[in-house]
Design a protein with these regions (language model features):
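Mid-domain, small-residue-enriched loop/turn segments at the edges of structured enzyme/sensor domains
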Residues: 132, 139-140, 156-214
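Sec-dependent N-terminal signal peptides of Gram-positive bacterial secreted proteins and lipoproteins
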Residues: 1-13
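Extracytoplasmic
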Residues: 68-70, 90-92, 96, 100-101, ...
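Short, well-structured active-site flanking segments
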Residues: 110-127, 225-229
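Structured C-terminal helix/loop/strand segments within mature extracytoplasmic catalytic/sensor domains
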Residues: 10-62, 94, 157-160, 211-311
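A short, well-structured edge-of-sheet supersecondary motif
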Residues: 54-88, 267-270
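Second-shell loop/turn segments in exported
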Residues: 89-96, 127-142, 150-158, 194-202, ...
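Active-site SXXK
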Residues: 94-119, 143, 210, 279
């Protein structure tokens, strides 16, 4: 089944009905490997002769990767300009981005000098958090790797509402709704150091939109500096296969309600020489089947790796 897709911009509802949920986070391992130096920012002064047609959607049966789990997958292969999607209904449904939003907050903070990756340590308040790795002074790279919510809560507050809204509008990031800035809708957690609009609150995005945003950040038409992209690549690097020249970059995210995970993500991009794939894998909870961001990550890596083999 092939159909054309029309992309919509952000809307700003003053208030929307959302399920209230708590938050958990996934953590990413980072191999010590050299980062690709292929720039993606369009040279200054270059213009497009005409607008490109909207990419088509091709529906795929990737059920074997999910093994009965409730999930969706989106791959956008830049060279053939098609979205390959498993479970289209779920892939077009918006959910909380949770810790995948650390890609966006890192992007904005790095681009605007709010975070300097070489001088990025923030002091721990002394409060004991559930994740032991957060109970100390922590720098940007470690905060990204461990999904340290208190660190990013501070960074996002320094970015501020006005700049955050402008950036999300420019990226067309889901519903772009930051109205619940402090995350008060999140009744599962009253600690405001660990809540925010991006954690089971007002901000929502679909798996397809996640892949689209990755292309806007790391694609040829990116409006972000190569230096910022390079810093993000360093913390997002998840797996590198020297034999196939495949590098996979991504970030986990997980949100919970009443102690049980309800949203699990892994999103990012993969690179092979001059080619690039933007992807997202999402898992949603169903009765009797646990989900995790680690499982979403495992599925994404396997799916992307197998897709590349078929080139």
């Amino acid at each position: 089944c092939v159909c054309l897709v029309i992309l919509a911009g952000c809307s700003h509802p003053a208030d929307t009905n959302h399920k209230e949920a708590g938050a958990g986070t996934g953590s990413d391992g980072k191999p010590s490997a050299e980062i690709s130096s292929m720039p993606t920012k369009k040279p200054e002064g270059e213009t497009l002769a005409e607008a490109s047609p909207e990419p088509a959607i091709v529906e795929e049966d990737w059920s074997e990767y999910f093994d009965g789990r409730n999930g969706a997958a989106v791959l956008y292969h830049a060279s053939d300009a098609r979205y390959r999607i498993y479970n289209k209904k779920l892939a077009l449904s918006r959910r909380s981005p949770c810790s995948t939003f650390k890609i966006i907050s890192s992007l904005i903070a790095l681009e605007n000098g709010i975070v300097d990756s070489d001088h990025s340590t923030r002091r721990w308040s002394g409060e004991q958090f559930w994740n032991e790795s957060w109970n100390r002074d922590i720098d940007f790279r470690e905060a990204f790797r461990t999904s340290c919510v208190w660190y990013y809560r501070e960074v996002i507050d320094e970015i501020g509402k006005k700049q955050m809204q402008q950036q999300l509008d420019a990226l067309r990031y889901g519903n772009c709704d930051i109205s619940d800035w402090k995350g008060r809708r999140n009744k599962n957690n009253s600690n405001r150091a660990l809540t925010g609009f991006w954690i089971e609150s007002s901000l929502k995005i679909s798996p397809k939109e996640q892949a689209e945003v990755m292309e806007r950040i790391f694609g040829e038409e990116s409006m972000y500096s190569w230096e910022t992209q390079k810093e993000l690549r360093q913390v997002m690097l998840t797996k590198r296969n020297k034999k196939t020249a495949l590098s996979i970059y991504g970030k986990t995210g997980m949100g919970a309600k009443q102690g049980e995970a309800v949203d699990a993500w892994f999103t990012g991009f993969a690179e092979m020489e001059e080619d690039r794939i933007y992807y997202c894998v999402y898992l949603g909870r169903i009765e009797g089947r646990n989900i995790s961001s680690d499982k979403a990550k495992e599925i994404a890596i396997e799916l992307v790796s197998d897709y590349v083999k078929g080139f």
